[in-house]
């Protein structure tokens, strides 16, 4: 059976964010807001054996590993269940955890699109840096709809789905995006046939992506912001959610409306920004999610396919 373990469910900065005193962050620190702290988003895809694919390497990876005993099977003096790392994009909050894995005993298998590998070899040269430590064994992901497997998890079929989103701010392609800067991931159990679609950074839902969402038994998608102008209204940024490559949850054409059109048995939001009112468990926004049958991912959540 294929299981998805949510290691981290917050957007970049985590929740509470280290330098933020918005209502959510200040309230969770003081105990005046009923909410659960969350680390920065990452999942582990696990098969029948102990090995797992780490999908995105969060800056919080060490804390996440400590909180997930299954990823430390202790079969040898030095051991890990992480068989490989797969990246959805080259965003800072999805790749810097690779630096924390530098003690890996041999070259760490890394799966990413050609454009992500290009950013990690140039603008943010993690591959060069890690060549002085464990090293990376890089594999370019196909973006043509072909399914692939990551050894030794041969019972899990993966498909990279290019998304309309943005390359990281540091990328020379930030304002000239290309397919592969950001992907969604179809995760299918080859035995049961059940599948999930994972997309923590989803700026637009075109017909191709919607078709992937409709096929999935479980969708685990971008829940970063409640409103498109959320950061602007709080005075934290001049950019909208759309400017940052995220589809807001509320409003016409928002993620809630998209999810309402899907037959999936589970609809789950991940990559939740610290400002999002859904984090407060007794908020009207959280209640609205419940009315629509939408769940909020949390660190430690397990999803069986």
Curated annotation (Swiss-Prot):
Keywords, sorted A to Z: PQQ biosynthesis, Transport
Pfam families reported in the protein's UniProt record: Lactamase_B_2 (PF12706)
Disulfide bonds: none
Pathway stated in the Swiss-Prot or TrEMBL entry: Cofactor biosynthesis; pyrroloquinoline quinone biosynthesis
SUPFAM superfamilies the UniProt entry points to: Metallo-hydrolase/oxidoreductase (SSF56281)
Biological processes annotated in GO: pyrroloquinoline quinone biosynthetic process
InterPro entries linked to this entry: Metallo-B-lactamas, PQQ_synth_PqqB, RibonucZ/Hydroxyglut_hydro
Function of the molecule: May be involved in the transport of PQQ or its precursor to the periplasm.
Protein family (similarity comment): Belongs to the PqqB family.
Protein name in the entry: Coenzyme PQQ synthesis protein B
Organism: Cupriavidus taiwanensis (strain DSM 17343 / BCRC 17206 / CCUG 44338 / CIP 107171 / LMG 19424 / R1)
């Amino acid at each position: 059976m294929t299981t998805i373990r949510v290691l981290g469910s917050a957007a970049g900065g985590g929740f509470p964010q280290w330098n933020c005193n918005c209502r959510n962050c200040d309230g969770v620190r003081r105990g005046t807001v009923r909410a659960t702290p969350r680390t920065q988003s990452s999942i582990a895809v696990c098969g029948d054996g102990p090995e797992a694919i780490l999908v995105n390497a969060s800056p919080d990876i060490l804390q996440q590993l400590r909180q997930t005993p299954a990823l430390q099977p202790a079969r040898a003096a030095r051991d890990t269940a992480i068989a490989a790392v797969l990246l959805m994009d080259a965003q800072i909050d999805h790749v810097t955890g690779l630096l924390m894995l530098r003690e890996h005993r041999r070259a760490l298998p890394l799966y990413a699109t050609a454009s992500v590998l290009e950013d990690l070899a140039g603008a943010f040269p993690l591959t060069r840096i890690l060549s002085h430590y464990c090293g990376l064994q890089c594999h370019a992901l196909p973006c043509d709809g072909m399914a692939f497997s990551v050894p030794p998890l041969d019972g899990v079929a993966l498909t990279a789905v290019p998304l309309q989103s943005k390359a990281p701010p540091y990328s020379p392609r930030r304002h000239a995006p290309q397919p592969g800067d950001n992907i969604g991931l179809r995760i299918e159990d080859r035995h049961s046939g059940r599948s999930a679609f994972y997309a923590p950074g989803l700026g637009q839902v075109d017909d191709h992506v919607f078709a992937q969402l409709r096929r999935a038994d479980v969708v685990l998608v971008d829940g970063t912001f409640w409103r498109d102008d959320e950061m602007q209204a709080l005075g934290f940024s001049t950019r909208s959610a759309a400017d940052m490559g995220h589809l807001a949850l509320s409003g016409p054409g928002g993620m809630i409306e998209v999810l309402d059109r899907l037959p999936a048995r589970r609809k789950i939001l991940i990559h939740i920004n610290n400002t999002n009112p859904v984090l407060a468990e007794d908020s009207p926004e959280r209640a609205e999610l419940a009315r629509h049958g939408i769940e909020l991912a949390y660190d430690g959540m397990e999803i069986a396919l």
